[in-house]
């Protein structure tokens, strides 16, 4: 990618939703294993000319693990600074993907360590509702606002800022996918309609490209809800919550207006012809205050 687009700065990402959180916890629990992880990550990043490192530990689950996360970040920062000094290279960027809120089920992220050690935080403001944990009712998987609960992109960003992380270090996550439910009744097809589990796939997840195919092939009805800042579509008893160009653009405007560093998406391979990518990019580059 860098050979084709030299201006693109790639990061080496470690972890993800499918990674073993217990393995991360074990690594972070001791100074020796943290050092081994840190040193090997720096060596690997340099070997392949990455510009930085991205940690995606989903998720620490105890107060001790959150404390150890803070130690890991501090030691990682010290190590990349030391390596850059000795090698003469530019200091590697350090980034992490975190929960949508600074509060994780009553546990708090190590705010000071995050502020001191990371260049930015990718805030995963999605997967709020899905058939896997809400099989009986539809909902907006990545609502920017939610008048019915505190679970939303805006509430999460607000929590991070109020906890002490600068808005300029926060990056808003956008999903290029959605979730599909099976409606109990085709006639009851709005947000929070009664449902009977997942549709289309085993967990209901569906890429944006597949959503467009579903809409086209089934002449599905599409709706944009500005209260939640979400899209949904339905045909028969299949209901899909997702983000389209209008919700994506609104979220990018929000990110810019709130003073965030920017936005990221999971993931561009699900965006055919860069429809959502271009909508976000246009909004970010043409934003102005009224």
Model-derived regions, located:
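Glycan-recognition patch characteristic of GH18 chitinases/ENGases
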Residues: 1-45, 278
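Conserved, mostly hydrophobic/aromatic
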Residues: 12, 55, 76, 121, ...
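Mobile, glycine-rich extracellular loop/lid and propeptide segments
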Residues: 15, 52-60
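Short, acidic/polar
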Residues: 28-49, 102-113, 153-158, 242-256
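Receiver (REC) domain switch/active-site residues of two-component response regulators
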Residues: 51, 119, 261
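Substrate-binding surface in catalytic domains of secreted glycosidases
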Residues: 59-211
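Acidic/aromatic/glycine-rich contiguous surface patches that form carbohydrate-binding/processing clefts
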Residues: 179-181, 243-290
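Hydrophobic, secondary-structure "cap" segments at the distal end of domains
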Residues: 201-259
